[in-house]
Curated annotation (Swiss-Prot):
Broad class of the protein's primary localization: cytoplasm
Identification of the protein by name: Glutamate--tRNA ligase
GO molecular function, a single term: tRNA binding
Gene responsible for this protein: gltX
Catalytic activity line of the entry: tRNA(Glu) + L-glutamate + ATP = L-glutamyl-tRNA(Glu) + AMP + diphosphate
Organism field: Christiangramia forsetii (strain DSM 17595 / CGMCC 1.15422 / KT0803) (Gramella forsetii)
Binding site for ATP: 263
NCBIfam families: gltX_bact
Assembly: Monomer.
InterPro entries in UniProt: aa-tRNA-synth_I_cd-bd, aa-tRNA-synth_I_codon-bd_sub2, aa-tRNA-synth_I_CS, aa_tRNA-synth_I_cd-bd_sf, Glu-tRNA-ligase_bac/mito, Glu/Gln-tRNA-synth, Glu/Gln-tRNA-synth_Ib_cat-dom, Glu_tRNA_lig_a-bdl
Entry keyword set: Aminoacyl-tRNA synthetase, ATP-binding, Cytoplasm, Ligase, Nucleotide-binding, Protein biosynthesis
One example of a Gene Ontology biological process annotation: glutamyl-tRNA aminoacylation
Keyword Glycosyltransferase: no
GO cellular component: cytosol
Protein family membership: Belongs to the class-I aminoacyl-tRNA synthetase family. Glutamate--tRNA ligase type 1 subfamily.
Amino acid sequence: MSSKVRVRFAPSPTGPLHIGGVRTALYNYLFAKKHGGDFVLRIEDTDQNRYVEGAEDYIIEALNWCGIPYDEGPGKEKGFGPYRQSERKDQYREYAEKLIKSGNAYYAFDTSDELDGHRKDHEEKGKTFIYNWHNRQKLKNSLSLSQEEVQEKLDGEEDYVIRFKSPQDETLHLKDVIRGDMEIDTNILDDKVLFKSDGMPTYHLANIVDDHLMEITHVIRGEEWLPSLALHYMLYRAFGWNAPQFAHLPLILKPQGKGKLSKRDGEKMGFPVFPLEWKDPESGDISAGYKEEGYFPEAVVNMLAFLGWNPGTEEEFFGLEDLTKAFELERVHKGGAKFDPEKTKWFQQHYIQLADNEFLADEFEKRLEKKEIEADKIYISEVVALIKERVVFVEDFWDQGYFFFIAPTSFDPKDSKKAWKEGTSELMTELNEYLKSIDNFEAEHLQETVKGWIKSKEIGFGKVMMPLRIALVGALQGPDLYKIAEFIGKEATLKRIQKAVDTLK
């Protein structure tokens, strides 16, 4: 076993990478980087019936978008490849045969129909059928049959599987970095299939062999694999290999807190559960992705890091570098972590505030070009700086600042009713005439002069400022009104006031 920390993320290419998988990859990445180790990507594609075209590319693209690229894996050979299990399948039989020779595994010739019959018989008696020490001598396998019968079946190309021979009357002492010490009675374990009748290994065998050959020192994976921990420990022991350290991560739960977060939850409640958009190659259905929904990868990574872990302080905003320094497996929670879509938006809003204005202006300019709106880059940057604190996504810049680029095409009915009263049109006409006489349209000067004009009229500020906002914006929203007037300029300001008077009189 290598003294250097080596971890692996080993997804199956059966569809898009769920954010639960991204979190597993993230924790592996953080642990490896903290300890100066390697983060390995291995594609576990032994189940060819479930293989989905494009899924592997999606996984790699998703990791890169999140800023957690692998050090070693497909396309990044480092001497431990191949990194797709389908390309390693020839070696698995060799290891399965070693287990048979050492007495730790055996051939089983029971057909699916025969096993279904045994299950049915047990169910009728109120029992559960388990293929293990209790009944393996009564079943059709190389432990119950003579050597001649076994050889005859093998020579006759009869279908068979290879099963692990679980020990009887033993207490296994297991250790998990997150969950501590555990004990398992081997009498309750079944003899798991290690090699299938189609000539492909199961996850259990391929996983253990690959982890050993790739010198993986720490296996950090989801808690759904916790029931397999005993088998995996026994496999390491059967091969005479040192086992890596194991850490089983808690589930990501639905927002309500009950059950594992699923794709359906996202569809029903309107939030993504995938890092990138995914188009199903068969149905053509499109599932939303965080990237396409406008989230920054920094926000998604920060959110995922806190789904099951915390640094032990009040601080919640961590970039990748800070996460790497702070991350400890021992601080990962045992219990499930409830997913909160609003918390994700909260992280996103934080990171958009930190984003460089020039970058945001470039992104906003792309949106403006789609709307066939031309604007000076400096002007766009100034608008971005003014309304930045009001947005969560880049797309929000238009909703929060469209009036900097086009005049309102309509006026919000509810807001207009609230702001435009009897006599308002006459008052706004007077204001328009007054503004024509002002040459300096800078916000600070405008504020001083307009306030003076309102005071001279002996009326409340709301009677002028609310309808003025309706005229310039189209609704009772937006940043400082004098800034809006300064940005759009004197001519546009006068035109908008006149249009409001003509429309709302």
